[in-house]
């Protein structure tokens, strides 16, 4: 039987049930409830590999759900929260999220939610370069524009964890004066660089520039993916039906 979980993200990011008695239901009971998905104009179904138990699939489902919630919180000032239903099917190892596309996100963008987001900072510009810090050592990221420069170039500010900052600073000291560069890799693709001669900024922030960061959209997407965290399991988009209203996100 398909197990269904209903989550409504409020502005306070509280998880509530559906209906007046929903708060009295246990999690297992919530998964057994049947809900009407016809009230949603969009949905995306993910196939998840590498889960052997319902608990493991549920954990991945929660990560995917959080990514969808983040999309709406960051891309839509008018509707910063998203009412949605999350459905897991352990037999098929799939996760489906039904929602109303009030943020007008495109199908192409929605597929980013399935990306592993394995981020690494490596010495040099080669894929086999020495890893300086890896996934789990990045705390936050945001796109920014250098308005003082003539071309208004975009970059991504990346905040490291305390452990990540310590490791990165030690690695930078060893590179000092050697003219080497640091490259940010995401899912096996080089997306930006960091000048090795620069010190880590206040609060453990480094600025990644160049590479694929050609405009606001590219910088925002990279920052969003860095904030979304790494999913260990292989996740692919099995089906995506998104109602786009005017201009795609």
Task: Please annotate each region the language model reported.
Residues 1-16:
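Sec-dependent bacterial lipoprotein signal peptides
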Residues 13, 18-249:
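A structural signal for conserved, well-ordered secondary-structure elements
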